[in-house]
């Protein structure tokens, strides 16, 4: 919490499998720069895991809209959304639903899929698997010494029991559908945007990011981090990324 009235109000939206603590380091860093950053466990994650089941796009987006509306009521100004991976897709869809309450969105390795090779073929395969074996689990390998992540983030993602490490097939299909929705609706987005992407991102294909850049056009800025991982806000360069976000927020604030 910054001293006095914050210069900007920011809502953090975490990635798939993660929870609100994804912003525990960035929150104080923002506060030191006069900004309020708040986050929460999105439906189906953290303290709200629902045994790993997918909460659904409608609930995820409506909760983000509710949170930003509450911040608007309290601080009487539009807020910013900072979304990582899944959180980026949620940010796109929430901004479309409440454009007057959102001053801008920051999309860090957002879950988007437009233009990827064999997109609909993969969809058919994943949908079939989710229908046949919805509870089948995919294991996510998370190492406490992952060099692609900041030390505190690597430990949290590997050791905190609130992090999902075994992903249900139907939840994975839900994530794919959410990413498709964000991709399909992105051309309608008019909100100022900052798009961030890492050269070591093995989760979101570059084709999806390039199509999103085209849709954002002159309403969006883009930053590329050659050594950046998929989870840019958890990476070793997280403070550099945070500085770029702070600079953009300062220039974009109404």
Name the predicted role of every residue range.
Residues 84-168:
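Alpha/beta-hydrolase-fold enzymes
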Residues 75-85:
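Alpha/beta-hydrolase fold nucleophile elbow
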Residues 16-28:
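The serine-hydrolase catalytic nucleophile loop
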Residues 191, 205-214:
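Short alpha-helix in the alpha/beta-hydrolase fold that links the catalytic acid
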Residues 189, 195-197, 201:
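Short beta-strand/loop motif that positions the catalytic acidic residue
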Residues 17-20, 45-75:
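Catalytic nucleophile-loop/oxyanion-hole region of alpha/beta-hydrolase
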Residues 27-51:
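Conserved alpha/beta-hydrolase
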Residues 219-254:
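Catalytic active-site module of serine/aspartate enzymes centered on a nucleophile-bearing elbow/loop
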